[in-house]
Amino acid sequence: MVDIVLVEPEIPNNTGAIARTCACTGARLHLVKPLGFDISDSAVKRAGLDYWYLVDIRVYDNVEQYFKMNGDANLWLTTTKAPKSYVDCDWSGDVTLMFGKETAGLPEWLREKYRDRCVRIPMISEARSLNLSNAAAILTYEALRQQGFKGLKDYGNMKQEESE
């Protein structure tokens, strides 16, 4: 199982796209306030398409409430500042992936507290960061790959005319 935690997300389209990733993978989505948008915002809904009924979404007033209700077992924080790459992580069991807001990332106190559980996605040095929804999808699918894509459809059914 994968849990995705967004701490103070600001851009509704990103949260909607991440919700769609959650819908397609069975991951749970945790949103930590303050949010930079209203959860009913049309941009959020549009980005998630008609998949919202498939999303297990939970909302928290602050980071402290999130930790009080969920703890920190299997928690991994994402930051461009981490020395460790996500490819070096063992996510073969349940995992919680925490992402910060688009403009500033996760608060420094969180990164310091969980320094040994911070990971990054490799990229060129000239770039500041990946899009939040892309980063969430990359790490979610890596965790699911390590978990053997448990619970996901593992076959396709292309018709002859589709492959031509």
Please annotate each region the language model reported.
Residues 1-164:
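Post-transcriptional modification and biogenesis factors for structured RNAs
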